[in-house]
Amino acid sequence: MFAVIKTGGKQYRVAANDTITIASLAGEAGEAVTFGEVLLFADGAGATQVGAPTLSGISVTGEIVRHGRDKKVIAFKKRRRQNSRRKRGHRQDHTVVRITGISA
């Protein structure tokens, strides 16, 4: 059994006991989180439900494992022969979530 959920503008294929890294969510480690935007649901018997765009009555629950930050991305601009350059770093926040179940 698996589902495709949408969170943070991206889509993720999840099943029970999966661990996913998504955009930053509010909440502390250990808190429960519910994803209501389910785009696709497939049970183990071969039946698949596809939403248009989402499915109602199906939700995915998870637990926040930890919060963290991605590797640094460097934005570097240089204007040749002008002795002009700019270097800026950015680290995006993320949240690691363990999927606890899919309720249909």
Curated annotation (Swiss-Prot):
Annotated Pfam families: Ribosomal_L21p
Keywords: Ribonucleoprotein, Ribosomal protein, RNA-binding, rRNA-binding
Biased composition regions of type Basic residues, renumbered to the chain: 78-91
Coiled-coil parts of chain: none
Region annotation (Disordered) ranges: 78-104
GO CC terms of this entry: cytoplasm; ribonucleoprotein complex; ribosome
Functional summary from the UniProt entry: This protein binds to 23S rRNA in the presence of protein L20.
Family label: Belongs to the bacterial ribosomal protein bL21 family.
PANTHER family for the chain: 50S RIBOSOMAL PROTEIN L21, LARGE RIBOSOMAL SUBUNIT PROTEIN BL21M
Stated name of the protein: Large ribosomal subunit protein bL21
Gene coding for it: rplU
